[in-house]
A protein has these predicted regions:
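C-terminal binding/interaction regions
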Residues: 22, 94, 101-114, 121-165, ...
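Conserved phosphate/anionic-ligand binding catalytic regions in large, soluble enzymes, centered on
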Residues: 54-69, 103, 165, 169, ...
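Ligand-binding beta-strand-loop-alpha-helix segment within the catalytic cores
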Residues: 109-160, 186-188, 192-236
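Conserved phosphate- and dinucleotide-binding cores of soluble alpha/beta proteins
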Residues: 193-350
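Electropositive phosphate-/nucleotide-binding environments in soluble metabolic enzymes
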Residues: 42-49, 60-64, 83-86, 90, ...
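Histidine-anchored nucleotide/phosphate-binding helix
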Residues: 173-183, 259
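Long amphipathic alpha-helical segments
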Residues: 8-124
Length: 350
């Protein structure tokens, strides 16, 4: 099968995200990468659910993990009858989709399709595990291909020799904008906000750009205004975990304040991604609240005295008036007109 992860950084190659083989799913532990390259092995789909909830894989990594988790679920009930297998896979589809609430709708598009594929395979006398793995790779190929178009559009917006600022880890878009920039013979500098508390910007995004030859600088999250004022930032960009049809987007916590600063300094902010058809407004966006202990410590080392409390919303919502454009596979949309994305046929994405 043709794959779309060719010439991608290590982090974005399918097997280095999550992969099913011989009754196990192995997931790259992004919590410790790049200090260590270690994979978490899951022998039940329930362990995959827990790994996603525990942030073993982040950004778009769960899109791969949930599909491979469905293959593992099919393996778990390989000796059962068709009806029992189907019931088990329906439950697995729900559990995997809801491993993290903010993106449950996106994960569900993958998991429920995997359940359908397994049922079709059983009816045809084929191996449902193999069918699910093939379906997941096809889903990855669709997403990577679509995001390549998005990456092409984003690269066109970046000035030659310019400087961009990123937030968190945009996963596929990072790889596709790098490929697009190379094709366009375009070079630029990259500033990566570290993205507390998991440091995805420092650990994941910066490495992808640096390994592909871009001049890359990491800043702490509280240096954003300084960098925008003094380091010649031309463009701020992020992906989004949810893009509502009214132009509101949800992304990693801290994106909202960065968008405010970009507006203050007159720096365009471009969001990349595909709008969510079932998210009509910001009221449809669910913000995941995580264990505040993850803010009070880093890698098990406490940062505060025991009496101190914390909060940890995983995402915040950016209103459309702070967004210069939403970069999609159909071009760049003014956020207030984003609903028009659905005026014409929408390609299957997940």
């Amino acid at each position: 099968m043709v794959r779309m992860d060719e010439n991608m950084p290590f982090l974005l190659q399918y097997e280095n995200v999550a992969w099913y083989e011989n009754g196990k799913v192995r997931i790259l532990d992004r919590r410790i990468y790049p200090t260590e390259v270690r994979f978490v092995e899951c022998v039940t789909y329930q362990e995959v659910v827990q790994a996603i909830a525990d942030m073993v894989t982040q950004s778009a990594g769960p899109y791969t993990a949930v599909g491979m988790g469905m293959a593992l679920a099919a393996w778990q009930v390989r000796d059962k009858g068709a009806a029992e297998q189907d019931a088990f896979l329906q439950q697995a589809a729900y559990d995997l989709a809801h491993a993290r609430p903010t993106t449950a709708n996106r994960y569900g598009q993958i998991t429920y399709r995997c359940a359908e594929v397994a049922k079709e395979a059983l009816a045809a006398g084929k191996d449902p595990v193999e069918a699910i793995v093939e379906n997941t790779v096809e889903s990855l190929n669709r997403r990577y291909s679509t995001m390549q178009i998005v990456g092409d559009h984003l690269a066109e917006l970046i000035p030659q020799g310019g400087t961009i600022l990123t937030q968190c880890f945009g996963e596929t878009i990072i790889g596709t904008v790098i490929r697009a920039a190379r094709r366009q013979n375009k070079d630029f500098k990259v500033f990566c906000a570290e993205t507390r508390p998991y440091l995805q910007g420092a650990r994941l995004t910066s490495g992808c750009f640096a390994q592909m030859g871009f001049d890359t600088t990491v800043i702490t999250d509280n240096m954003v205004a300084y960098a925008m004022e003094r380091e010649g930032i031309d463009l701020f960009t992020s992906a989004a975990d949810t893009i509502a049809r009214d132009g509101h987007i949800a992304n990693k916590i801290g994106t909202f304040q960065m968008a405010i600063l970009a507006k203050y300094f007159g720096i365009p902010y471009y969001v990349t991604g595909i709008p969510d058809q079932d998210k009509h407004s910001k009221d449809d966006i669910v913000i995941e609240m995580r264990d505040p202990q993850q803010v009070l410590s880093y890698r098990g080392i406490p940062n505060t005295v025991p009496e101190v409390k914390a909060i940890y919303p995983s995402f915040d919502v950016v209103p459309p008036h702070l967004i210069s454009g939403v970069v999609t596979d159909k071009g760049v949309y003014v956020p207030y007109l984003l609903d028009h994305y659905f005026d014409s046929d929408v390609k299957k994405f997940y």
